[in-house]
A protein has these predicted regions:
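Short, charged beta-turn/beta-strand-edge "cap" motif at the junction between a beta-strand
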Residues: 36-41
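C-terminal terminal-subdomain/extension
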Residues: 1-10, 23, 83-145
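Short alpha-helix capping/helix-loop boundary micro-motifs
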Residues: 14-21
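Preference for short coil/turn "hinge" residues that link or interrupt alpha-helices
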Residues: 18, 76, 102-105
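Compact nucleic-acid interaction/catalytic patches
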Residues: 43-87
Length: 145
């Protein structure tokens, strides 16, 4: 098991919190975000700044958006949506959708084509509505109470 550096992330998190909001964020954009070190199966950032790319799914206001983290490895295709960007293959982690502050946004990568974005949105809606594809309680690592 990989050791998580919560202390280093806490220092970065403090400076992230002090940043101004990023008002230039829009739906369909792919950005590097400061994800940090998270708990359990929550997706972590990587590299020395604990960052990773994510797709902006929905912008609520200047400070708050829904994002979908990306990865280059999909373990179970039921929980990931594949897309190609800049000649590379990525997977959107459907189970990791989250609300984040625009203070976490570091640098813009680009804009996902509308046809791909519409496909991703449709997949998110279908994923949320179709609960039988959720990981079964038997595969959960957490013991039953």
């Amino acid at each position: 098991m990989t050791q998580k550096d919560f202390d280093k992330w806490n220092e970065i998190k403090k400076s992230t919190n002090d940043k101004p909001d990023n008002f230039g964020v829009h739906e369909r954009e792919i950005w590097w975000l400061s994800f940090g070190v998270n708990v359990g199966v929550e997706i972590d950032g990587k590299n020395e700044h604990f960052d990773r790319p994510a797709l902006v799914l929905r912008k609520f206001n200047r400070q708050m958006v829904w994002i979908l983290p990306t990865t280059q490895q999909a373990r179970d295709e039921r929980f990931y949506e594949k897309f190609t960007f800049g000649g590379e293959t990525f997977f959107i982690a459907l189970t990791q959708i989250r609300t984040v502050s625009t203070k976490r946004f570091l640098r813009k990568v680009g804009m996902l084509p509308l046809v791909d974005f519409d496909r991703v949105k449709a997949r998110v809606v279908a994923f949320v509505q179709k609960h039988e594809d959720s990981p079964s309680s038997e595969s959960s690592r957490r013991p039953k109470p």
